[in-house]
């Protein structure tokens, strides 16, 4: 059905406008005098694209910074893995008209595999990087065998929701699983559940825990991380949990049904997200960590203290500067003993001490001190072998220093770049890293990668949190964090992509 939307002069160049047509939300734009209409809702989590930023013909979602072509609807940056629907637009007698329904809204970018191709592409790890790599191989026209190996017997899913929403019993809107079973069947992506115990780059073979082997023409190593254990007496008691998988989250939720008092060990992103989610469930929550300020190493003391105050206002109690020396209880946890001799009562303990790269099977490949692996800008580890996601130390945008970044969107970007290079393309990874963290339905966005900094410049208020934080080293902004600044942080991705040497005042003015 064709809809009269507006007069031709009513939509200014470069403006994003959302309209509802036939029950569908449509995003209308005008670029170089040409009108375009695509879906107005981000397929990742339902973000309102009209509140995003338009840059070089691409709209960046204000929520999680997925990006789409406004001309074709193509998803050009994750975390979205699906394109937007695209609608025909015409201008008749000075009126802009959009047709919704009655025709295919877009051409599926993944054609069915055709032709004879005997090559086998193997992906170890079915998380963000692995799932996107498998999809990209088919999108790029590869017609051979694609094998996606994971340790969990379920479809690849959005791991970010576990600490942010699953523990609270709420839903955040993220699409999970990433694709349904029909997708993998239709595009002949073989899903194997198993544990890889060895990889031989010279012979190009994988060995599984059951002794089976699989040869490959090119392989991607994307196993992600494994939780760092709590090595104290009593850490194996019932009611003590780590959080990495959906099964872990389900076990925590099951324990929470019968718990009243929770101790979270660790004040990093996962620990604080878990604390917030369990507090939203109505439990009494205490957080124990050796550092004096939450997230201080990642965000600095000022922003870290803002997170502490945010959680304290919700009733979370912090025990900082403390080491856990034992978990107390008989068969089931009853308390957490601290280094000062005190004991915190607990019916449930969640351990969030970070993760280490899950690279134990790479005995024939050189590994870093932190168990990661060094890759080049194409994410190549060796001939025919690539690495992506948490395990890959890649040349960071700007200075080229090899850096591991343990964040979902970066892993998805890695998966796409690695897959294209597995097929013989020459694509470098030079994106600006981005991640988000959510606490009590409030989100902090972080663009760039500071590592270390000389100073942090705060624009806004820390308590209550509503700010931009600029991380400055050698008089150049290395990263920007924003709390409650959705649109500005979407713009920051483009600005830091275009220019790598921003002085803080110039970037602050550019963000408005």
Residue ranges and their predicted role:
Residues 116-190, 228, 275-299, 491:
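Beta1-alpha1 glycine-rich phosphate/pyrophosphate-binding loop at the start
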Residues 1-55, 90-103:
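N-terminal pre-ligand scaffold of iron-sulfur
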Residues 503-512:
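Cysteine/selenocysteine-centered motifs that mediate thiol-based redox chemistry or coordinate metal-sulfur cofactors
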Residues 117-122, 391-488:
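Mid-to-C-terminal Rossmann-like scaffold of FAD/NAD(P)H-dependent oxidoreductases
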Residues 62, 68-95, 99-122, 180-263, ...:
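FAD-binding core/adjacent interface of flavoenzyme oxidoreductases
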Residues 236-257, 331-337, 342-417:
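FAD-site-proximal beta/loop scaffold in flavoenzymes
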Residues 125-129, 244-245, 266-268:
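Glycine-rich Rossmann-fold phosphate-binding loop(s) that bind the pyrophosphate
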Residues 21-22, 143, 182, 187-208, ...:
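A Rossmann-like FAD-binding core segment of flavoenzymes
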